[in-house]
Amino acid sequence: MEVISTNTNGSTIFKNGAIPMNGHQSGTSKHLNGYQNGTSKHQNGHHNGTSEHRNGHQNGISEHQNGHQNGTSEQQNGTISHDNGNELLGNSNSIKLGWFSEFSALWPGEAFSLKVEKLLFQGKSDYQDVMLFESATYGKVLTLDGAIQHTENGGFPYTEMIVHLPLGSIPNPKKVLIIGGGIGFTLFEMLRYPTIEKIDIVEIDDVVVDVSRKSFPYLAANFNDPRVTLVLGDGAAFVKAAQAGYYDAIIVDSSDPIGPAKDLFERPFFEAVAKALRPGGVVCTQAESIWLHMHIIKQIIANCRQVFKGSVNYAWTTVPTYPTGVIGYMLCSTEGPEVDFKNPINPIDKETTQVKSKLAPLKFYNSDIHKAAFILPSFARSMIES
């Protein structure tokens, strides 16, 4: 493994010596708080983040839910804008009476709670509050700024689908970029593919990586794979600085497209992603819940259709610890060899194919679920196709 971090002025130094633009800290995860691009899903003002999964806008563990507003979104020149309705409903990163609860203006009128068996870690990085606890039902739970990023025994549907939907749709993936993924679940799934030669992981928050090394050693061990380069820095800037046509696939395990995180879902970022992909290359990014955010999903699709000249598709799956129990994905390809996302050509679940692994069996993904992920409820289909 090669680890690349940032220099004294805060900019990231890559292997080729390029120093990316300051400001948008892109990151690494799908959920975290506010780091615009990948690693956090909440609103700290750092573009991207570090966590591996999910939604969450700042929310907290507060017991009160006063006066939250649900902002509407508009699209202007490819941007996703909201009013000030995404404020946190409580910013207390603590456990109340043995329960962790997550409130957010992103899902007003509802909350999600888990019984806490043991607090394993609580601290503050340069970017966010980080907490890890043992839950009664889902094993270890990682939260960032009060938002659940991943659960050990409930997050595997998200991870398996964000990796195998795109990589199962192209032959012989070799070079892959992960924006986010500092815990290591996404990397774990990616290493099932023996054809892969190079994996770059961009994580903004070194504390998240440290938590992985201490609490998920079986995941952190994969950072030592000689094919892996771990970059502690800005994911959006990394993509902009990437060599044109270099990657076969890019996985964007990003934060929500609201507040500072919205840059990861707008045209300039998608244009940088498309440039970094080879002809017929693929990208998969998280794309919210059809039960809460259809207006956001429509804007993301509109942006992607303007940039990606291959195919643009929306898929979804179930994740028990995410709001409404579901999460969506955008899957797009660049112009070149045709990519049919709905019919996997490289199905990792088939022992008879070239894709074999010594890892534990898949818990969620299979070829049938791959195909079914693109079948949408009538209300969602009509809105997306309109």
From Swiss-Prot:
S-adenosyl-L-methionine binds at Q128, E203, D234, G235, Y322. GO terms for molecular function: putrescine N-methyltransferase activity; spermidine synthase activity. One of its GO terms (cellular component) is cytosol. SUPFAM superfamilies: S-adenosyl-L-methionine-dependent methyltransferases. PROSITE patterns: PABS_1, PABS_2, SAM_MT_PUTRESCINE. Residues 1-87 are annotated as: Disordered. One of its GO terms (biological process) is alkaloid metabolic process. Keywords: Alkaloid metabolism, Methyltransferase, Polyamine biosynthesis, Putrescine biosynthesis, S-adenosyl-L-methionine, Transferase. It is an enzyme of class 2 (transferase). The active site is at D253. Residues 97-334 form the PABS domain. Pathway: Alkaloid biosynthesis; nicotine biosynthesis. Its EC number is 2.1.1.53. It catalyses: putrescine + S-adenosyl-L-methionine = N-methylputrescine + S-adenosyl-L-homocysteine + H(+). Residues 1-14, 23-48, 57-87 have a biased composition (Polar residues). Predominantly expressed in roots. Involved in the biosynthesis of pyridine alkaloid natural products, leading mainly to the production of anabasine, anatabine, nicotine and nornicotine, effective deterrents against herbivores with antiparasitic and pesticide properties (neurotoxins); nornicotine serves as the precursor in the synthesis of the carcinogen compound N'-nitrosonornicotine (NNN). Methyltransferase that mediates the conversion of putrescine to N-methylputrescine. Promotes leaves ripening. Belongs to the class I-like SAM-binding methyltransferase superfamily. Putrescine methyltransferase family. This is Putrescine N-methyltransferase 4. It comes from Nicotiana tabacum. The gene is PMT4.
